Amino acid sequence: MILTTTTAGSATAEVTITVDKAVQRMIVTVGGQPRYDWPVSTGADGYDTPGGSYRPQRMERTHFSREFDDAPMPFAIFFTGQGHAIHGTNHLRQLGSAVSHGCVRLSVRNAAALFALVKAEGTGNTHVQIEGDDLSMAGGNGGYQQTARTRRGYDVDSVMSAGDQMGRGM
């Protein structure tokens, strides 16, 4: 008599995060099926978001930029060794415009959903694809209003509650 046991393993699906700099959108597919379509902000002039294919290198629920005045980067998914990440922002009016310092910004709520998805499916099953020309190089703005960038980074007084903004209550 041969006994076999099976354990209920967690099935993982391939997650593809595609960022199109020309239209400032992120499309997320899971197992080849579209899951999310969100507005983003990529690098402003002089702060390019590098094109190419990547895998997440590390994830940090609460991160503050050492390079840009301790700017909050909630739900950060780092995809280059130079510190480029997908992360949340509370500058919601700037989504759809190329205004970041090279990271891919999206709303905190969407960043939290993406972070949870990548954590559940695994960084090894996740691909980050950055494509398209920058808005300024594409000769258009993708139908979005271009906003001026500032060197200040984040207006800390306008953030949501610290627990909500940085995911500490989760």
Where in this protein do the model-derived segments appear?
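N-terminal membrane-targeting/anchoring regions of envelope/secretory proteins
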Residues: I2-L3, N90
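N-terminal signal peptide c-region/cleavage motif recognized by signal peptidases
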Residues: T6-A8
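Cell wall/extracellular polymer interaction/catalysis modules
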Residues: S10-G46, S53, P74-A76
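Beta-strand residues in well-ordered beta-sheet regions across diverse protein folds
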Residues: I27-T29, Q57, H87
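Active-site donor-binding loop signature of nucleotide-sugar glycosyltransferases
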Residues: V40-T42, R58, G88
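Exported/periplasmic cell-wall-interacting domains
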Residues: D48-S53, E60-M170
